[in-house]
Amino acid sequence: NDAGFRKVFAITKRNILKETDGIFWAAVEKTQREFKTIGLEEYYIDNMTQQLVKNPERFNNSVLLSTNLFMDIISECASGHVGSIGTVYSGNYGDHYAMFEPAHGSAPKYAGKNKVNPVATILSGAWMVEYLGEKHISKAIFKATEDVINENKYVTYCLLYTSPSPRD
């Protein structure tokens, strides 16, 4: 595949949600027959959240695929590995178009309080620019964002790194 993904992890609970996840799983299997070079593995949602905490690198260069409810759970769980949900961006791809957005909601309770992390919005734009064929611009945005975060000077409270005290 062009994107470099090695495996799709489909997340269900079809042992309990037989009808809805049964429909989802049938669609996954049908699609997998068209893309035989990409591996497919099924995880139940409860086990997937545990694996994301214990062994997140297992899912590098892979696609996590599920229904909206389970992906809401997964995105919250996984966001802890990268700082907060404020850093998670997403892309929804169709046959001819794509849409990019932060994974978090609008958080109106934080309006005007200078607390909201802009990283997901910035990186959503970087991913969109890459989709539009401007990979060099996308790389520059990702690099600049990474540099600012690593500098640890201009970050929101959810990313602020403080050294552990000698007692820790």
Over which residues does each language-model region extend?
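Glycine-rich phosphate/nucleotide-binding loop
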Residues: 51-152
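Short acidic loop-to-helix transition motifs that present clustered carboxylates
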Residues: 43-51
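Conserved small/polar residues in nucleotide/adenosyl-binding loops
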Residues: 161-168
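Glycine-rich phosphate/diphosphate-binding loop of Rossmann-like nucleotide-binding domains
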Residues: 1-44
